[in-house]
Swiss-Prot record:
Subcellular location: Nucleus, Nucleolus
Protein name according to UniProt: 60S ribosomal subunit assembly/export protein LOC1
Keyword Disulfide bond: no
The organism's taxonomic lineage, starting at the top: Eukaryota, Fungi, Dikarya, Ascomycota, Pezizomycotina
Basic and acidic residues composition bias: residue spans: 135-159, 170-180
Keyword field: Coiled coil, mRNA transport, Nucleus, Ribosome biogenesis, Transport
Amino acid sequence: MAPSRTSTVKNKNASKHAANGSGIRNSKTVSRAQSDGVSKSKGKKATQSKGAPPKQQKQGSKLATLKKKRRVYTEKELGIPALNMITPVGVEKPKGKKKGKVFVDDRESMMTILAMVNADKDGQIESKMMRARQMEEIREARKAEHERKQQLQKEKLSEMKQGLRKKRNRGGDDDGDNGRGEALAGTKPLKPKKKTVSFA
C-alpha cells in the first residue's frame, strides 16, 4: 500500500490564532481584539469613586451662570453723549442737564461775567496799544537825540572851518606882500619844480 500523507502541525496554537489574523500569542493586536468591548480607564474610576465632580463641568456651569446674569445697560446709564450737539470748549456737562445750553440761572450774573471777560480782553488790547505808543515815543526821542548830535557836530565843523578861514585871511593879508618880496629877494625859496622823466 502507498503511504498516506499526514498534515504535521508545527504550532499547536496556530489554528486558534489564525482566526484572529496573527500567529504570535503575546502580540498587541491580540490584546486589542480581546479588549474591543467597553473600555474603562482606571483614572476615571478613581475620581468617580471619590465622589468629586470633574473640574471642566464646574467651569462650564460658571460660564453659563455668568452669561445668564450679564446685564444690559442703557445709554443714559453708561453716560454716552448724544450726537449733533454743539458745545463750547471747556464746559463740563452737569448730570441731567443739557451741555452748553444753559450757562447761568440769572441773566444779570451772566452779563457781569461777560463784561469781566470783555474788560480783560480790552485790557490786553489796551496794554498792547500802550506798549506800541511807548515804543513809538522811545523811537521819536532817540531820533531827536540823534538829530541833535548831528547838528552839534555840524556846528562844531562849521565853527572850525570859519576859524581856519579867518586865520588864512588874516595871515594872507599880512604876509601876502612880504612873501612876494622875499621870494623875489631870494630869502624865501620858491616852490621847487617837479622832476619829470621822459622815455625815448
